Amino acid sequence: RSRHSQKGGKLILGYGYGSTTDSLDPGTSENGMTQGIHKAYGNLLFDTENTGELKGDLVESHEGSNGAKTWALNLRRGVEFHNGKTLDADDVITTLNYHRGESSKSAAKGLLSGISDIRKGSKTQVIFELSSGNGDFPYLLSDYHLVIMPAKGGNVDPLAGMGTGPYVLQSFEPGVKGTFVKNANYWRSDRGHFDEVEILTILDTTARQNAVMNGEVHAVNEVDPKFVSLMKRNPGIDILQTTGTKHYTFPMRLDTKPFDNYDLRMALKLSVKRQELVDKILLGFGALGNDIPVNGAMPFHNDTIAQREYDVDRAAFHYKKSGHSGTIPLNVSDAAFPGAVDAAQLIAASAKDAGINIEVIREPKDGYWSNVWNKKGWCACYWGGRPTPDWMFKAAYTKDTEWNDTAWRGTKASKRFNELVVAAASETDQAVRRTKYFEAQELLHDDGGVILPMFANYIMAHTKKLAHEPNVAANWEMDGNRLAERWWFA
């Protein structure tokens, strides 16, 4: 494969994400564009390969012991940061402590809350002690926020854009672009083929699709399903689809009235015509969601929970029981996902038949992720999903994660859910583990604040001038957001 790959050239990527409020801090990265930037200049301890398999990135070998409570990670030797510093255990420990710190605003803080101690085994070995065993621990360390940064004087500089990755960051303009040149010292000779890379934010779907059709960029993500057949007619363009765990949600915050009311949440969950959304918004490029962020692509998916259907009578019953009257605001933008505004309007129309009045408020695309999502009571969102239930729950649903965008805390069900997530992680009997994850999904499905109507395929378009390996990762868009590292010009 890489034997035939051409070296050189300038790659230009167009992302439908990015905001003027973005920063280079990996801990606050919240969209595909900044993730693409971090993965161009940096490396993680582990990552999902394009085969779907979890492999060591900066880790050469690892071993769990003591009931998966103790983990020893042996780092690759001779890996250099772009400033010439050799990677060692201090860099790993200091980076992770930056995310774990008391005042940390990192989205990965909750993921790492199970770590009780990190220490140096040797210059190239890091030892982790967990408060309870977790057989999935290496998966958590592949979270895209955990780009390893160089330590200096016991600290890291999260805004430096300094890493060990295939490209050296030259410039970054938030919500506009990042530019890179090849790292001649990259530790993987079979990756990082381009001389230069440019990653652009192109929020407008039509402009983004035109950019790849006109040859201004080489690849774009988030192709609108409505345009797939038109773009396929272009002889110079390939459409690439991957099916994974990406899903679209409408999170209701339990810390904001009226969403603190169980019956109101249930009324809204029953007011959604999911199949209509899959048909009209995804045009079939996806599958039904059932208000749980776990699907058949993941282990321990609870397929015994009946598919939640549109039920106007039950929706009206729960709405009346909630005691609510008046309009319910739903703040959305197509920044969340292509067709989010249309999806919200379809939900408003189907809810009206149950006597529920939803006011769809269209928000600006720029700043949506910092001003609306995780702040307003009800909005639209997308998640790339995660390969295991443990990781997905810790990313968005446990009490201590910054990204618990439904603020699902404090209810009896949420307390039980948090207990189950901790217990399931350290459970070595897979049948018992399955029972715990199944119950956790039932609690979330019933009491949680998420409306998750659909799982969406990743759809990207690229020029036929680009070549790639037979497998393309489905854990994120753009080949796991490592297109710049893995692809080459044919």
Could you tell me what each predicted segment is?
Residues G14-N66, N97, M162-G163:
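N-terminal lobe/hinge region of extracytoplasmic solute-binding protein
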Residues I12, L87-N97, K123-E129, G165-P166, ...:
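Alpha-helical secondary-structure segments
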